[in-house]
Amino acid sequence: MDPLMAHQRAQDAFAALLANVRADQLGGPTPCSEWTINDLIEHVVGGNEQVGRWAASPIEPPARPDGLVAAHQAAAAVAHEIFAAPGGMSATFKLPLGEVPGQVFIGLRTTDVLTHAWDLAAATGQSTDLDPELAVERLAAARALVGPQFRGPGKPFADEKPCPRERPPADQLAAFLGRTVR
């Protein structure tokens, strides 16, 4: 799948779920035990804002609009524009984990956003059967990249959790990245 299309589909999945989150749910727990729903949303919006800050020629994001959905959409649009710009896929991004080309970074962002869309769905009682084609692709990418060095306390991912093969691909992705699928 085209990386820009995949990125947009992950952002769209998150936005669709976010539109159904009620204010009284924001303090609730998520599959990421250290985060509330509001923290999870902030992580995704903030991650999108960081794309410009980590670019070879750093770009500060515009002021956040009011409202969670508007803030996400604005930050996602700017991140997408940076990747889609001429040279965006070959540009070097300076992440905390090191320098990576745009082609790699967009895949990391896509997986992060889709996985946190799953977290948001699970936390708010929405369907976790998210974009099966995209989830299959991101699961394959995660299997290639996420080894034992990235799992455990103080690391980005918990150990892989069991997930029946008949479950939707997004559930399988979530379980591979350490979420308990119910």
From Swiss-Prot:
Residues 151-172 are annotated as: Disordered. Residues 157-169 have a biased composition (Basic and acidic residues). It holds the Pfam family MDMPI_N. GO terms for molecular function: metal ion binding. InterPro entries: CHP03086, DinB/YfiT-like, Maleyloyr_isom, MDMPI_metal-binding. This is Uncharacterized protein MT0763. It comes from Mycobacterium tuberculosis (strain CDC 1551 / Oshkosh). The lineage of its organism: Bacteria, Bacillati, Actinomycetota, Actinomycetes, Mycobacteriales.
